[in-house]
A protein has these predicted regions:
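Short helix/loop segment immediately N-terminal to the Walker
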Residues: 375-379, 436-453, 549-575, 639-677, ...
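Phosphate/ATP-binding catalytic cores across multiple sugar-kinase/actin-like superfamilies
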Residues: 228-250, 421-450, 538-571, 723-774, ...
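Phosphate-binding glycine-rich/basic clefts of nucleotide- and phosphate-handling proteins
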Residues: 278-373, 594-734
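Phosphate/oxyanion-binding active-site loops and adjacent basic polyanion-contact surfaces
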Residues: 218-228, 353-357, 411-437, 467-474, ...
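Glycine-rich phosphate-binding loops at beta-strand->alpha-helix junctions
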Residues: 455-473, 585, 775-792
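Glycine-rich phosphate-binding loop of actin/hexokinase-like ATP-binding domains
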Residues: 257-295, 532-536, 541-637
């Protein structure tokens, strides 16, 4: 039996991932036999399990009748020495049997399945309920192993008799739940008499899909569900859940965000009272994938968003009005958004543009105009056309342009401005952060695993020379997202009749909008730095060097790297100063900060920064990415053998094949919009850039510091998230050859050559400034700065 797992009450949706080994012997041992009879109380056919009677006559009887006659023990076993003469006998021709493990796995694989996780009492028996708080998803790895994800809606009820949501007792031993241990209760979990008809309706749809005619056995979906529950129980891998009270105090966690034009990264760190900060406890923000629930993405992620609601099963909302398993954000971001768009076929089939995604909301902080068309949820099924964005509990807070409404009259249309889209990104990030900090993994890692975590501060960095209006908009969106998520839980919990305090309304966004709004005459009243993207690396560098390399002794650091401050007014104590220049090359801007640091000799070390020069330049990683796509992927001259397969690869591959009018074809596919390029052509060009060109360019950039060339095929490049078939077919029809046939050479020298051509002038200007201010240390940050060619410049 797997150890029990712990979830904190009222900590939103919590996920637990584990592997389960399938035992072939369990299939035979857990077969389920049953009869179907019309039930007048339920007014439909219902089933009753049949079990074998002792003896050699191959006779069976209904378990329900045996229970009524007292022939079933308290443990659910048949009392074999009973007199069965009065029992109605059933032979093998009168009942049905299910027990095909592969078949039931095919029906349930990659679907969210409601699971009866019921409360245990002190004598290890189970009560019936709660009925709607745990669901299971699995994917088969091989014939003997499946990957499993459990998700629990941890919202609790204030009513101890509630059968839908869990109630948290003061006695911790009363808050242990496990998968239902007997078939009778499992059957009750699908029974309309227990208000669980929604489960049976959902399981029925998974089995019968679009079948219009049915024949006996009518209830094989229920029988297979019971068989599946038997398998889960017999494997012993489904853990018990211990639901911990959220009323024993909480621990603050801070979130630091660097929202980029193309990539975003975030870190979480605890501030447990009485403990000094430890960089080793910092965790990257992980994004739980909802489309592929077994995937969790801990790396930096794309800022692209797509409107798509997170669902945990297509349940009939008329039958299930519990309002459980609600995720507050209507957007997906990062890897999941990329995959959704790569797999999209609906736009082509609809032959119209579906306004469901945006490449980078941060680019449009100035655009507060309503969209000309309504935003729609992305659909991956042509039979389910896109619908306008409406998220219960969120849409009621918004004006039509996506801003927070100040009264109860909310907007009737989803024509959100591009500026407001960043608020939706924050909404998703904060929901993911709250999920992660209350996960069992995070709590166990940081200690005090029984205490709830809350977001306390959200620190958001920005480009060094970002204009004040955009700085305010960047942080204002975060403040609005916090407000929205607090209000959301107030609206949803009122419907659920639950008690919950998920998000702390005193969350601080740093720097605050109030701070940023101070004019030049009141800057001394500011509480916080603006945490620009060039200064942040300096702070981390100073902390790391002094604390770890110099054992916490700033004297050693300043004596080694610094110089005498001859401008000091204190002639007796001329402290040494260190001037640091930092260059951060991001996606949209390259930021420069030159700052002089001094410190005093008091008992408490105080290092004082004095900014000398700062600027942002609109030349950065996106410009390099564009040049790599243009020069390596699309068109370019092969002037020597070294350029082959890494210069104008598409153009030169076409010429080698003898394709006519190559330049015209390139212009027709990649050129500017014209009347000759229809909707499909424009869509395919966008899809090519997003699905093919950018991923390949990033692979080239990732190889920039490696030694030697690397030859890759199409399948090598796209081991995950391959381009859509429609896009590849369109490419072939346009150019006359398959894109998959192209061979690619990842050439570090070619990438570094392009990098030098893009940044040489800028680096020369920055180097002049660094020399002018006589910097003692120069810090390079950002992915591009790791390229050898840039260091050489």
């Amino acid at each position: 039996m797997r150890d029990a797992i712990t979830f904190i009450a009222n900590s939103g949706l919590q996920f637990y991932h584990f592997d389960m080994r399938l035992d072939s012997a369990a299939q035979k041992a857990n077969k389920f036999r049953y009869v179907e009879r019309f039930d007048s109380l339920r007014r439909k056919f219902w089933l009753d399990e049949v079990i074998a009677l002792p003896g050699d006559d191959d006779l069976y009887a209904r378990k329900g009748e045996l229970e009524q006659l007292g022939f079933i023990s308290a443990t659910g076993k048949l009392i074999t020495d009973s007199d069965f003469s009065a029992v109605e006998k059933i032979d093998e021709t009168e009942f049905f049997e299910v027990g095909n493990l592969n078949q039931v796995l095919r029906y349930f694989e990659k679907k969210w399945i409601p699971i009866p996780f019921f409360k245990k009492n002190n004598i290890s028996n189970q009560f019936f309920g709660p009925t709607d708080w745990v669901r299971l998803y699995f994917e088969r790895i091989n014939e003997t192993m499946i990957k499993v994800v459990l998700v629990a809606d941890t919202s609790t009820s204030a009513d101890p008799n509630d059968t839908v949501s869990p109630f948290v007792h003061e006695n911790p031993n009363e808050n242990i739940f496990s998968i239902c241990s007997d078939d009778k209760s499992v059957l009750g979990f699908l029974d309309s008499l227990n208000n669980c008809e929604w489960v049976e309706d959902y399981i029925s749809k998974l089995f019968y899909a679009r079948e219009t005619e049915m024949e006996q056995p009518f209830l094989r979906h229920i029988a297979n569900y019971i068989f599946f529950m038997r398998i889960l129980r017999s494997m012993g891998d489904v853990p018990q859940i211990h639901l911990l009270s959220d009323q024993v105090g909480f621990i603050d966690v801070d979130l630091v965000l660097d929202v980029g034009n193309s990539k975003t990264c975030a870190i979480l760190f605890e501030n447990a009272s009485g403990h000094s900060f430890n960089f080793n406890s910092v965790k990257k923000l992980s994004i739980q994938d909802f489309g592929n629930p077994h995937q969790v993405h801990p790396e930096s992620f794309s800022t692209r968003l797509v409107f798509k609601d997170a669902t945990f099963g297509a349940f009939n909302t008329e039958l299930n009005q519990n309002n459980k398993f609600q995720w507050p954000s209507p957007v997906r971001i990062g890897n999941e958004a990329e995959r959704i768009l790569n797999d999209s076929k609906v736009e082509l089939q609809l032959t119209r543009e579906v306004k469901s995604y945006n490449s980078s909301p941060k680019r449009y902080l100035w655009d507060n105009h309503e969209s000309s068309f309504e935003w729609e949820y992305h659909s991956d099924d042509i039979n389910i056309p896109p619908t306008r964005v409406y998220k219960k509990g969120i849409s009621e807070q918004l004006n039509s342009d996506g801003t927070l409404c100040l009264d109860s009259v909310f907007g009737s249309r989803s024509v959100f401005s591009r500026k407001s889209l960043l608020t939706f990104v924050y909404l998703e990030l904060f929901a993911q952060a709250f999920r992660q900090i209350n996960s069992m993994e995070f709590r166990s890692l940081h200690g005090n695993p029984s205490m709830k975590r809350k977001l306390r501060r959200i620190i958001i960095s920005c480009p060094t020379a970002m204009i004040k209006k955009e700085q305010i908009a960047l942080r204002q969106s975060a403040s609005q997202a916090i407000t929205m998520i607090n209000r959301y839980h107030g609206l949803i919990d009122a419907v659920q009749n639950t008690q919950i305090d998920v998000y702390d309304h005193t969350v601080e966004v740093i720097p605050s909008v109030k701070d940023l709004n101070l004019d030049l005459y009141n800057l001394d009243k500011r509480k916080d730095w603006i945490y620009d993207e060039a200064t942040a690396p300096q702070l981390v560098f100073l902390y790391g060097m002094i604390k770890h390399k110099f054992d916490g002794n700033p004297d050693l650091f300043f004596n080694l790297y610094g110089k005498q401050n001859n401008n000091s007014l204190d002639k007796k104590n001329k402290n040494r100063t260190v001037t640091i220049g930092s260059i951060d090359i991001g996606g949209g801007t390259s930021d420069l900060m030159i700052c002089r640091y001094s410190y005093n000799y008091d008992e408490i070390t105080q290092i004082t920064p004095e900014p000398l020069y700062w600027e942002s330049f609109n030349l950065a990683g996106d410009d390099l990415l564009k040049e790599i796509i243009q020069q390596i992927i699309i068109e370019g001259t092969v002037s020597n053998e070294q350029d082959r397969d890494c210069s104008g690869v598409i153009e030169n591959h076409a010429r080698q094949l003898g394709i006519p009018e190559v330049a015209k074809k390139l212009n027709g596919f990649f050129g500017k919009d014209s009347n000759n390029i229809g909707f499909k052509g424009k869509l395919m060009r966008i899809n090519f850039i997003n699905q093919i060109a950018i991923p390949i360019a990033l692979r080239y950039m990732g190889h920039a510091n490696k030694e030697g060339d690397l030859y890759l095929s199409f399948s090598d490049l796209f081991t995950t998230n391959p381009p859509g078939k429609e896009l590849l077919d369109y490419f072939e029809n346009h150019f006359g050859f398959r894109f998959e046939d192209i061979r690619w050479k990842l050439s570090p020298s070619k990438v570094n050559e392009i990098t030098q051509s893009v940044f040489s002038k800028l680096v020369g200007q920055i180097s002049g400034l660094v020399g002018l201010y006589n910097c003692d240390i120069v810090i390079l940050s950002g992915k591009i700065c790791s390229f050898q060619s840039l260091e050489n410049l």
